[in-house]
Amino acid sequence: MSEKKINLLDLDRKALRALFTEMGEKPFRADQLMKWIYHFGVSDFEEMTNINKVLRAKLAAKCEIVAPEISSYQKSVDGTIKFAINVGDGQEVETVYIPEDDRATLCVSSQVGCALECTFCSTAQQGFNRNLTVAEIVGQIWRVADFIGFVKDTGERPITNVVMMGMGEPLLNLKNVIPAMDIMLDDFGFSLSKRRVTLSTSGVVPALDKLGDVLDVALAVSIHAPNDELRDVLVPVNKKYPLEEFLGGIRRYIAKSNANRGRVTVEYVMLDHINDSTDQAHELAKLMKDTPCKVNLIPFNPYPGSPYGRSSNSRIDRFSKVLMEYGLTVIVRKTRGDDIDAACGQLAGDIRDRTKRLAKKQMQQNQISVTIN
């Protein structure tokens, strides 16, 4: 049985340099290799012309460069593209490319499904199977960049921003998310500014503290409710890490970070007559008074079977004005890709649910149906 080859997309620069040293090669060769992979989109060692022929042969015998394949894609009328990425065993995660005039953002997944159970999120309703590997995380960027088109002669990439806001809770996969983001930030990797890489979390506080100790990227926090009582329902991880504990973790992260320019982005999904009253706006403003932030109001994007509706524009406008009265910077997010279910909260993928969440939900619905009838 042949030895399994090392997928080089799994290795950040430190690990890749260690591999080259182990192979009896100069560590700087790792930098050259990374440039070929991430700047020029090359996966064939024979195309790496500044690496000598003997080393190319050694690499081909021991290593491979394999990103997960694109199974299918859909393009929205607004230019947004949703990709289904095949991660094996018949499972897919979803990745979304969002082009704008001055940037091109890729929304990347970190898990097959999600271990959390936020009640307004389509991904959460699909259950959870496993964490994605480093290669599967950076491979989403690599594969989409290849699809859109690397500029081979300059190394210019078609993706300028990455947001870890796809399927999954990134802080529950720190082992793989940290080296993946290292590759995103590395000058020999995707060479993105730390202000152009954003991690979004629902509030796994110990992991947030650990992230702040080792990496500096922009942070977005999923608040979605102005008090613990409502957040316990909408974002059940709140029962373990309630708002004050989460806000303390956020402030500690901001204190360590340069990428956030002294403040964090608060994400707040607008659910009709659930969390969008003017009283709740006052409550949210008071909650955030000691945490430097800008607030991103996200019109809810319905999915099949969703128990919630989208707040009206007038309710969003009133909510926004209350927050601004407190001096908060408020942005109402422009919905992108909702016609192809690629908008915030709509990603679902194709998942083998190890949590049996879908089965339990179906059983509960059947029991309700029997009771009603």
Curated annotation (Swiss-Prot):
| Family under the similarity heading | Belongs to the radical SAM superfamily. RlmN family.
Pfam families for the chain: Radical_SAM, RlmN_N
- The protein's predominant localisation is cytoplasm
Query: Which cysteine residues pair off into disulfide bonds?
Result: C107-C344
General remark: Reaction proceeds by a ping-pong mechanism involving intermediate methylation of a conserved cysteine residue.
Q: Which domain of life is it from?
A: Bacteria
Q: What is its EC number?
A: 2.1.1.192
Tell me how the cofactor is bound. Answer: Binds 1 [4Fe-4S] cluster. The cluster is coordinated with 3 cysteines and an exchangeable S-adenosyl-L-methionine.
Give the signal peptide as a residue range, or say none if absent. none
- Cofactor(s) this protein requires: [4Fe-4S] cluster
The subcellular localization recorded is: Cytoplasm
What gene is this protein a product of? rlmN
Q: What name appears for this protein in its UniProt entry? A: Dual-specificity RNA methyltransferase RlmN
